[in-house]
Amino acid sequence: EKSGATVILFDGNEKLHEEAIRMKLPSASKAQILIGQISDEQLKELDLVVLSPGVPTDLPVVEKMKAAGIRIWGEVELAYENAKGDVLAITGTNGKTTTTSLLGEIMKCWKESVYVVGNIGNPYTQAAPKMTEESVTVAEISSFQLETIDQFHPKVSAILNITPDHL
């Protein structure tokens, strides 16, 4: 909403109530809320869909959005679009959190403005508005988060290891 975009919140859970959603998300007071189904007409209004973390990309409604040519982003892509500074990204099957934390501490010895974000529990989107060109972001990126990136292009990336469950 701050960027001038029209925001539509959608949840396929028909048991949800709009009032409950608005209470949990007071910052989305101007957003349109759709619950249950999304029509073909409503799909035509969408330019971009940002999936909440944990929403599978193979859900029928997401597949329908992809088939309609709508860009599908995750939280990482949305944050990257609005962040500044250099990004160091860590992915792989095991050791991501330890490596991300260690690299974050090393970077803090070198730079004042360091953000450790991503799958480590600190949302990238919360840190992005605070960043400057001098900032360094150390991001733990899961295999699921990699499915919903488009332009995310870290300055440095590391793939720690890959086991069959991540292929």
Indicate where each model-derived feature is located:
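N-terminal leader/targeting and accessory segments in enzymes
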Residues: 1-74, 78
